């Protein structure tokens, strides 16, 4: 458990030095390059996940895009473009944020953690996984 906490702290400290990639506005013009702290928290999470997950390919099955684990019945291709992978990442992250909505400002933190290790390892699953230490501390 200590290793996980140290890993999370290292991830956060490393991500502070990562610059966000150039964003395109809706009219197609490139906006000026922004640093990570000039982005919204949700955009920061997307940038960090994209950076550390990388684009998964056929050899990474059952993971596609930026770490999306295929669910039964889903038909996403392992050859998806970076844009398609980002759309899927944003969709997954929004779903996880909604799952943790009751935790208020910490919902994005929990969503990013759940994207990495799975929501049931954060929430706990009777008989399989205990509730995560991070969640226990937030509830205290």
Mark where each language-model region is.
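Cell-wall polysaccharide-cleaving catalytic domain and substrate-binding groove, primarily
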Residues: 16-108, 112-140
């Amino acid at each position: 458990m200590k290793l996980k906490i140290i890993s999370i702290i290292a991830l956060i400290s490393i991500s502070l030095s990562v610059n966000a990639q150039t964003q395109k506005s809706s009219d197609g013009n490139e906006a000026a390059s922004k640093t990570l702290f000039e982005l919204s928290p949700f955009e920061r999470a997307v940038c960090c996940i994209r950076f550390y997950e990388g684009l998964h390919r056929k050899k990474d099955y059952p993971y596609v895009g930026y770490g999306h684990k295929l669910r039964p019945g889903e038909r996403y291709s392992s050859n998806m473009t970076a844009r398609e992978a980002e759309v899927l990442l944003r969709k997954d992250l929004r779903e996880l944020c909604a799952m943790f909505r009751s935790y208020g400002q910490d919902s994005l933190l929990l969503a990013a953690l759940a994207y990495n290790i799975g929501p049931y390892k954060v929430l706990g699953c009777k008989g399989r996984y205990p509730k995560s230490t991070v969640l226990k501390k937030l509830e205290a």
